[in-house]
Every structure is written in C-alpha cells, then in structure tokens.
C-alpha cells in the first residue's frame, strides 16, 4: 500500500511551483519598494508564545494548533500565524533599539492549523505577511493597507474590496466590552458553548462566531463605533482620509472584529468579489496590535501588520482568469548523436550553464527525433546538435527554434556565442 499525502496538505509540483515563485518574487519586490526587510523565524515555537500572543479564547489556540512535547518535555507548537513569532524575535533581538524606527519586516512561510480542509483552506498553508512595529502614526496603517492593495492590483486582480473597522483603544474596547456583556448575558444560554465561555473572557469574539451568526442578538449587538472615544474616532477618521488620498477604496463594517485577541484600533480585510471564487471570500486581513509587544515581554511599542494566503490568491487569479507572465522555457537543448558525441555534449552543456544559460541534454540515448521532441516540450529557444561529423569539423549545428534558422558555430566559442544571442 502506497503512502499518501496527509489530509489538508498539497504537493506543489514543477509546472505549478513556478507560479508560486513568481508570486513570492513580486511580494519581495513590493516590500523592497516600501522598505520592508525579510525576517525568517522558526517553524515551531514555544506554545506559550501563542497562548499569550494570539489569545487563549481564539479558535486558533483552542482548536487548531499542532502542539507536541519534545524529548525535554517542552510544549512546542507549529506556528499557526506569523505575527507572534515576528514580535517574539523583535523583542528577543532588541530590534526596538535600532536607530531606524519603525521596524518594518516581512515574511513568507508555512503555517499550520488543524482545520477542516476545503477550497482555499489547508492544514499547511503559506502566508505572506508584513509587520511595522514602533509607530502610532495613522499613516502607517494606511501604508500597510495600500501595500496589500497594490500587491493584488499588481497581480492583475480587479474584483477586490477593502473592508475597514476600528476596535478603538483600550478604553474604547472596555466600554464596548461592558456593553456586549450586558447585551448577551440575559440570553447567553441560547448560544454555543464557545460563545458562553467567551462572554466574560472576550465577548467581542462572540460576534465572530460562525455557529450563531444568524441569532437575532447578533444583528442588534452594540457596535464598537458607538463606543469609540474622541482619540479613537479621530484616529479612525485619519486612516480613512489617508486611504482616500492614496486612491484605496474601502467599505466600513462595524461588525468586522478579526479572529485574534491582540487587535486594537484599525482592523481590515481584503476580499474577492470574483464570481466563482467560493464561500471563503477573505484573501487577507490584519490590523493594529498596540499591546502585543508588551504581552510578549518587550517595551510598550505599537505595531500593525497583515497576512495573506498565497493559496487564496491563486484561487482569486483563477477566478478572474488571470495568466501571470511566467517563463517555462530553457535557453538551449543539446542533442548528441553517437557515442563519440555524448561526452562532448556533456561538456558543451556544462560550458553553456557556466555562461549563465538554462540548459538540458539527453540522458536516455534517445534518437534525434525524440530528443527534438524533448526540446519542444521544454520550450527550448535553441537546439545544439552535436554528432561525429560536427566533432570532426570542430563545429556545432545551432537551430533557432522560433525562426527555424540554422547555422554552424565553432565549438571553442559556442557557449559565448549563444550567450550573446540571448542577451
């Protein structure tokens, strides 16, 4: 019996992985333009990091983490999200002491959550995320959102929308929390066990419940916007003003809360409105986390960031029938005819690769017709034919596969000649 891939994971094979590489390359390029630097953190962290950093009332911590004990009986967890590990590294490596503040970081990496697999939702998935730590300026909130929108636009997506909300500062959240408890408590017995446990710990999370989202109390729950104090309201207005100036359209949704405990002030999601995208329309989301650095043991430092699913981005590209400009060709295929030419063909291929070209050759002693078919499948720009006659003359026959033109090139200058033709 063959061993199958674990449920909720996928193999990304040649022919498809080039799409991922292109997307990741574009992510790195936009981060370069916005001056975000790459950070790489471990795939597993101490479980305590996520208990404190993500919140013990969240679905992630309660139901979705892959946790285990190592041989030293330490509880470790495969990272379910990227913000807490980045903030942990920021604190541990004292990045808050750097002269250039805020600290602007990005990551591209695998995350792990034990969820029910479905379209756009895997148990192992890849996120591209950014974090800007050290500034309370609303301009950086707008910058983070604008970066995400510009990235999607650069991919060619047109059917996207930004949904925006504010959770306010700590005082605003407390006032809203008290109002939510008063609203839900008399009838909390009608809600699921998760909502009942969240009533005292974090009633805001009740609004994010999938089981009871159609309960009548959900529609009449007090909105956070009713409890924003003056400072929070001014901050929210400024973020909206800046987004408008940056030509980033958005919709306000007072019910948007996001699924993590660390958010304050700005929260947002970017969604696909493409037909046929599927039930899960969220492409990315993020927000401001002004207490998280302290929670993880650092100084009082504000931060904001987002994370986007590469898998869902690919779904959105397919839903909008977008073909990205991905190169699937090689520069040259070396055809060897006869035993004498085989060893020389290996040397020719080596010299071409040394000159910086993408090159392939036959390794199965196939006939010339079959070798040319291989060159076609690999979309070779040139085919170099080397037989015993060519060896005796000290030449190689070079065929341009686009025009069909052929020419004889001296063997000793062949690599540099082909390289110049491809410049």
From Swiss-Prot:
Its EC number is 6.1.1.21. It holds the Pfam family HGTP_anticodon. The keyword Cytoplasm applies. One of its GO terms (molecular function) is transferase activity. It is found in: Cytoplasm. Its main location: cytoplasm. It catalyses: tRNA(His) + L-histidine + ATP = L-histidyl-tRNA(His) + AMP + diphosphate + H(+). GO terms for cellular component: cytoplasm. GO terms for biological process: histidyl-tRNA aminoacylation. It is an enzyme of class 6 (ligase). The keyword Membrane does not apply. Keywords: Aminoacyl-tRNA synthetase, ATP-binding, Cytoplasm, Ligase, Nucleotide-binding, Protein biosynthesis. Belongs to the class-II aminoacyl-tRNA synthetase family. NCBIfam families: hisS (TIGR00442). Homodimer. This is Histidine--tRNA ligase 2. It comes from Bacillus anthracis. The gene is hisS-2.
